From Swiss-Prot:
Family: Belongs to the peptidase A8 family.
Biochemical pathway: Protein modification; lipoprotein biosynthesis (signal peptide cleavage)
Classification via PANTHER family: LIPOPROTEIN SIGNAL PEPTIDASE
Entry protein name: Lipoprotein signal peptidase
Active site: D118, D136
Encoding gene (name): lspA
EC number: 3.4.23.36
Lineage: Bacteria, Pseudomonadati, Pseudomonadota, Alphaproteobacteria, Hyphomicrobiales
Catalytic activity from the UniProt record: Release of signal peptides from bacterial membrane prolipoproteins. Hydrolyzes -Xaa-Yaa-Zaa-|-(S,diacylglyceryl)Cys-, in which Xaa is hydrophobic (preferably Leu), and Yaa (Ala or Ser) and Zaa (Gly or Ala) have small, neutral side chains
Organism: Methylocella silvestris (strain DSM 15510 / CIP 108128 / LMG 27833 / NCIMB 13906 / BL2)
Matches recorded under HAMAP family: LspA
Record's keyword terms, sorted: Aspartyl protease, Cell inner membrane, Cell membrane, Hydrolase, Membrane, Protease, Transmembrane, Transmembrane helix
Localization (cell): Cell inner membrane
Amino acid sequence: MSPRVLGALVAALTLAADQANKLWLIFVYGIEQRQPIALAPFLDVVYAKNPGISYSLLSARTDFQRYALLGLTLAATIFMILWLWRSTSKLIACALGLIIGGALGNAYDRAAYGFVADFYHFHVGSFSWYVFNLADAAIVAGVALLLYDSLFSARGAGTGGKSRGEGASAL
């Protein structure tokens, strides 16, 4: 399977899993009326409406702000799609697929509902992490894979900093 096809498949599966999870929790399970649900001593399922991005940064309270944030998300997604199209590395294709699928999942929420639905809340004692969704987890995993590739991929002499998987010579 080519990196392009692999990345597109990962993006589609990520988007589908994210949207299915959100729709099931909201409309089938009814999380809004049943929260919080303790999955583990450190993990709850809750329902949070996030008008911004991670940590509610760039909170979009007006229609203009929401559409500006949506436009920024779509521009970044287009950049990632172009990067995926040029990728020759399956690792990078998977990473970009995770980021693209997650970004599209959250962009859909923002366009359709005016906010992103978040559900998962990690906490230990008084420490509390932000509430996130599968799309956010996919984006973080994709960025982690890109970081892994940039730190640990074999580098060839004269590659201009490119990993072998991205068109660099193995010599």
